[in-house]
């Protein structure tokens, strides 16, 4: 009987030992020597300039961690696919990354419609969608164990900042010009909500179709209304076009945008007319002469590598990979989707050297931070004018 029990115990132990490496092998994208992650960028479409910077920042951080020995001895491999900012292409790119490349996680995918197209494919294979480059609420709502975001929503950026601007400068008539799509509606609704909290309402609402280049009628309408602050739901070309049109008409109204228009391209392409423009932002643009020594050194390293100055999207790319590295490290040497999720739901970190806000996640909080700050273009450079706005 004793021999029989001993035999059974030995068999059970053998199965347990055999199952341990099997559990690791069954975690897609994780081997003894490597962690494979994927991203999808627009390398051939309308926001290729942003994605080029993102790609550079991501690859820079990957090279750094690999040179330092990796994560618990595993090198990090980043596979980049081009979706051209097209949801149909995003579906194909996601299928390749999941089925052929066997990624462990999707990190830093750019675009709301493309992320929405990718998530069902990822989630069906138990693959997380981490830190997409979009401020849409759908990136963390409704709550799902496999989706996590870090970017303050357009709605919340505008809700808080429009109240702050009114209180700071005493504006009496707030108007808005926004893109006629989901992005623009989020901006408009945020402005409405913020003004309602201080017993105000939008004095004028104007829209434009995506791809528009003439904003003269919208600007004239808002000027006739007597607006003294215009909230812009615009990106690059539309921001420059609207402000430029207003200045040509001799209308020196104040303009405020969102993180979608917080880019060095505004002042580089728009010139002196862009001075005075306000925008919300969640991280500071890294100028080569930044006040921070750490940022200056980072920017110099970036420029040496890529032969161009870094920009805010370079920082976004660097940050999302850095965040993945930190959480994967906390997950420990036995990296699985479950251990990663357990680590992220207990994760928090202070502000980083780029001015990014404190981040924290939990089982019920899958957005790292929902705060933004205001910056203004002064003498051709973005300059912070507030800390992170809480109300």
Question: What kind of region is each of these model predictions?
Answer:
Residues 88, 102-205, 254-279:
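Extracytoplasmic ligand/sensor domains, especially the bilobed periplasmic-binding protein
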Residues 304-314, 325-382:
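Segments of small-molecule ligand-sensing domains
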Residues 1-36, 389-391:
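Short, low-complexity disordered leader/linker segments with a strong preference
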Residues 243-317, 384, 388-390:
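Extracellular/periplasmic periplasmic-binding protein-like sensory domains
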Residues 34-36, 49-56, 64, 68-140, ...:
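Beta-alpha junction/loop-to-helix N-cap segments that form part of ligand/metal-binding clefts
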Residues 42, 63, 322-330:
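Short glycine/serine- and small hydrophobic-enriched flexible loop segments
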Residues 25-39, 67-76, 166-172:
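Immediate post-signal peptide segment of exported/extracytoplasmic ligand-binding proteins
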Residues 29-59, 81-88, 110-113, 177-186, ...:
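Extracytoplasmic "Venus flytrap"
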């Amino acid at each position: 009987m004793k021999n029989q029990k001993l035999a059974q115990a030995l068999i059970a132990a053998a199965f347990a030992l055999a199952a341990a490496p099997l559990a690791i092998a069954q975690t897609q994208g994780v081997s003894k020597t490597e962690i494979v992650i994927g991203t999808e960028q627009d390398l051939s479409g309308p926001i290729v300039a942003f994605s080029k910077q993102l790609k550079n920042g991501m690859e820079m951080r990957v090279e750094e961690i690999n040179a330092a020995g990796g994560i618990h001895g595993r090198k990090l491999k980043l596979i980049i696919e081009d979706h051209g900012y097209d949801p149909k292409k995003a579906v194909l790119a996601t299928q390749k990354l999941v089925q052929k490349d066997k990624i462990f996680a999707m990190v830093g995918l750019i675009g709301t419609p493309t992320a929405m197209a990718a998530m069902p494919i990822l989630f069906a294979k138990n693959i997380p969608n981490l830190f997409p480059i979009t401020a849409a609420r759908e990136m963390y709502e409704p709550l799902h164990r496999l989706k996590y975001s870090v970017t303050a929503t357009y709605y919340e950026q505008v809700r808080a900042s429009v109240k702050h601007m009114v209180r700071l400068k005493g504006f009496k008539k707030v108007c808005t010009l926004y893109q006629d799509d989901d992005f623009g509606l989020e901006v408009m609704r945020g402005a409405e909500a913020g003004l309602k909290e201080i017993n105000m309402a939008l004095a004028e609402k104007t829209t434009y179709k995506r791809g528009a280049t003439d904003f003269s009628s919208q600007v004239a309408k808002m000027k006739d209304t007597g607006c003294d602050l215009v909230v812009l739901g615009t990106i690059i070309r539309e921001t420059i076009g609207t402000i430029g049109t207003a200045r040509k008409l001799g209308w020196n109204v104040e303009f405020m945008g969102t993180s979608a228009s917080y880019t060095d391209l505004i002042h580089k392409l728009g010139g002196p007319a862009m001075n005075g423009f306000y925008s919300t932002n969640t991280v500071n643009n890294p100028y080569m002469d930044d006040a921070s020594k750490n940022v200056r050194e980072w920017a110099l390293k970036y420029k040496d590598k890529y032969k161009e100055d870094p920009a805010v999207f370079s920082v976004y790319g660097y940050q999302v990979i850095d965040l993945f590295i930190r959480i994967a490290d906390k997950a420990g040497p036995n990296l699985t989707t479950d251990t990663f999720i357990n680590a992220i739901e207990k994760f928090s970190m202070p502000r980083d050297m780029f001015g990014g806000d404190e981040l924290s996640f939990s089982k019920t909080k899958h957005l790292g931070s929902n705060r933004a700050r205001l910056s203004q273009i002064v003498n051709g450079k973005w300059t912070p004018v507030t800390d992170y706005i809480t109300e």
